[in-house]
Amino acid sequence: MATSITAGLQKAQQAVQDTATKNKKIVDISHDTVNVHTDQEQRTDFGVAITDPDHWLRVTNETHSGPSLLEDHIARERIHRFDHERIPERVVHARGTGAYGNFTLKESIEDLTYAGVLTDTSRNTPVFVRFSTVQGSRGSADTVRDVRGFAVKFYTDEGNWDIVGNNIPVFFIQDAIKFPDFVHAVKPEPHNEVPQAQTAHNNFWDFVYLHPEATHMFMWAMSDRAIPRSYRMMQGFGVNTFSLVNKEGKRHFVKFHWIPHLGVHSLVWDEALKLAGQDPDFHRKDLMEAIDNKAYPKWDFAIQAIPEEDQDKFEFDIFDATKVWPEEQVPLRVVGELELNRNIDEFFPETEQVAFCTSHIVPGIDFSDDPLLQGRNFSYQDTQISRLGVNWEEIPINRPVCPFLNHNRDGAKRHRITKGTVNYWPNRFEANPPASDKGFKSHPAPITGRKRRDLTPKFKEYHNQAQLFYNSLSEVEKVHVKKAFSFELDHCDDPIVYERLAGQRLAEIDLPLAQAVAEMVGAPIPTKALRDNHGKTSVRLSQFDFTPKAPGIISRRIAIIIGDGYDKIAFNGMKAAILAAQALPFVIGTKRSAIYAQGEDKNSSKGVIPDHMYDGMRSTMFDATFIPGGSHIETLQKNGQIRYWIAETFGHLKALGAMGEAAQLVKEVLGNVMGVQIAGADSAEPVEWYGVVTARGPESAESLSEGFKVLKDAGDFTSKFFYQISQHRNWQRELDGLASTVAF
């Protein structure tokens, strides 16, 4: 039974949450929301009070417990309900998480569309967003190498509009008819159901080699885009080509983009592998944590638009989902902003039962002849019926916030009761008539041609944009692509698979890349390019082109490692500075019981209770680590896991801060690294070396927590340390070969 104090606190917290984040959709689902934290007695689903939920009705006497009785309707109901709790998981995108928020239009695009959600800047449109992986099952890990789903449901005044996108702007196939074969190939192999949530197996690489249209996409999949640091730090793309139609009936073809305010950042591969076991829920917890801490994730909403009459003016077909529209040719126009500000209350009825459809569009938005989109429009509707039943749009999370009524009736799991004597149109009462002027109208696009199974010649060019993407990457991103191919193909044990992918297909993209990968995986090393690299580059294909909208360390997770005898001044000052910068400090102790500062009397001080002890966490779960000085360093020096934590932080290219005696510990751990530079006890200024920031102990906590700025050339310790965190990683540490000299 909930205590009155607990219930009161929860009620107050809920009131604050509701006031800050309430919108039309939150109000709508509130009618179907109940709170289990109540003194209300248990009842069956048919309303009968339950007096004993712990014992099945059975025949007993003083010495013997006899058979259970099937007449126990309460027990049977509980078992029946339990036996049927699971529903079919999504065939793809099964693993996911979601949150509520709002979409705000910053600039009307009435020159392109008459859709209210894209023309009325006074609106605040509720949204639900679901992020996901593609390949794995519901129980797979968050940090696998994979495309990420980025699906947005807008609850507009004219109906629901869904952008069912990904964090990569292109796809593996051009025609939806190939989707079953592609998914079969990327999923676990049929003879043994292995591997889970990975492309590192024979069937996937066999399929993509035999489908050269997949070349561009698998270059993206081998890049850092496929291992994002956070859902909050990845782009989103509509992938397909849609249409916008304005009041004059003029049509533009468009692509949709989401650009994160925090910039685009990724994990490193070793880190992603480890997190898959250490914290398989890393991404979903990261999203919930940020929202709970009011570090609300935000994205700019942008479009690319091509007038209908210009659709044939490009070297690529604009309806080909394996191609991007280079921004030099089709500029990006930022028109809105997405903010996520409310976590879900219950996973199953909200995140698991939410259902997206590419065919969910509103007046002013239309489809195109994109052959992948045409098939998706059928598939998504069909799969929701299989998963949730024909009345899936009556489920609270899926229903629109605008009034809706039609003559659809019956079917499994129908909830709505429709009064009236007719269920058809036209009818003698003129009841529930079609919309007059405000309804959806398909654009009257002219179509000529012959019925055949084929695509236009432009679809058959597969290499130019794969080269364009690779050419546009930074040096370190190219290193990661090479390593990713080497890892993936090393897991293929059929020589024909890795030999022709490394020695032939990659030689059509970039010869040095093909040679490096072939050598690593044991394939014949190609001696000449099978296709000349055109040498062209394009902006904003490298994720390094997407820096945070404002410099800072907001929502970054920073570990502070302490043991008995830590420097209290350094600890208090750094923790205060981290909080002031709107980042998240986590105290990692040698134990999760009271830890006392150097000179503190255990009898007169409460000490500090760490958030975690070191063995319960790993450096992989944090963006940076800080270690204050003090006599506790004598204890930390003898702890192998703490030493490994420091080495792993360095190996994963993260910022590392140490003061006083801790600087010497860092130097000891990094002893094999050439040229390590740290601050000595008499150093007047902090020392920054490849993202490792050290200094002598501070004179006061305020010297750390006040007056800092996130600037590269700042002179104080905090500013230098925070700047390194803001850069996400010290990539030069990897390029100069320093990270690889440390065992981690």
UniProtKB/Swiss-Prot annotation:
Predominant location: other
Catalytic activity as recorded in UniProt: 2 H2O2 = O2 + 2 H2O
Cofactor(s) the protein requires to work: heme
GO biological processes: cellular response to heat; cellular response to hydrogen peroxide; cellular response to iron ion starvation; hydrogen peroxide catabolic process; response to oxidative stress; sporulation resulting in formation of a cellular spore
Gene3D superfamilies, sorted: 1.20.1370.20, 3.40.50.880, Catalase core domain
Keywords: Heme, Hydrogen peroxide, Iron, Metal-binding, Oxidoreductase, Peroxidase, Peroxisome, Sporulation
Binding-site positions, heme: Y380
CC annotations in GO: cytosol; peroxisomal matrix
Coiled coil: none
One Gene Ontology term of the molecular function aspect: metal ion binding
Pfam families: Catalase (PF00199), Catalase-rel (PF06628), Catalase_C (PF18011)
InterPro entries: Catalase, Catalase_AS, Catalase_clade2, Catalase_clade2_helical, Catalase_core, Catalase_haem_BS, Catalase_immune_responsive, Catalase_large_C
EC number: 1.11.1.6
Location of the active site: H93, N166
Intracellular or extracellular location(s): Peroxisome matrix
Family the entry assigns: Belongs to the catalase family.
General function of this protein: Catalyzes the degradation of hydrogen peroxide (H(2)O(2)) generated by peroxisomal oxidases to water and oxygen, thereby protecting cells from the toxic effects of hydrogen peroxide.
Protein name in UniProt: Catalase A
Provenance organism: Emericella nidulans (strain FGSC A4 / ATCC 38163 / CBS 112.46 / NRRL 194 / M139) (Aspergillus nidulans)
Lineage of origin: Eukaryota, Fungi, Dikarya, Ascomycota, Pezizomycotina
